[in-house]
Amino acid sequence: VTTAKALAWTNDCALVGVPTASCLATQAVAECGLRNEVEVIFDAGRGELYAVTASLLEDNLIWTISQGTLRTPNEWRETLPPNALVTGPGLATQHDSIQQLVDAPGTLEVPTSAAWYPRARTASAIGLAAFEKGRLTSPAQLTPSYLRASYAEDRSRP
């Protein structure tokens, strides 16, 4: 994010922010078929998952991303809707429990592990689509999303 902002300020141009969850949702539907929603999880460390829902807005590329939540793996699995399409790097830490859910008919669908991580080709396609629709972000407005303080920040507090 910092490099993109510096380049945009230096060249006096706007940016297009592409959420990682949008990238992963696009890849999941490309592999598994169109869905209106995709559940995306990331490993949040400390035994938790960061979960968001990507809802299709337009063009199979532009997604609305829900407010993320931190959940234990059990809490996350309990909130999955039936027949959910699930993706994201958090699946790598949940392999055994996800496999049990995938094996049960009508529970959820998971793309191959190659689709769990964002690809530059997908990010650029989403970025171009957003640019063509005028969905630009000023460098000052583009910020990464942090859910909590790092381990170091937690330890530095009294």
Regions found by a protein language model. Name each.
Residues 136-140:
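Flexible, glycine/charged-enriched surface loops at secondary-structure junctions
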Residues 124:
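Active-site glycine/GP-rich loop and adjacent strand/helix microenvironment
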Residues 127-135:
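Short, hydrophobic alpha-helical segments
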Residues 13-118, 132, 146, 151-156:
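Surface "functional belts" at beta-alpha junctions
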Residues 1-13, 99-100:
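Short Gly/Thr/Asp-enriched flexible loops that form oxyanion-binding sites at enzyme active sites
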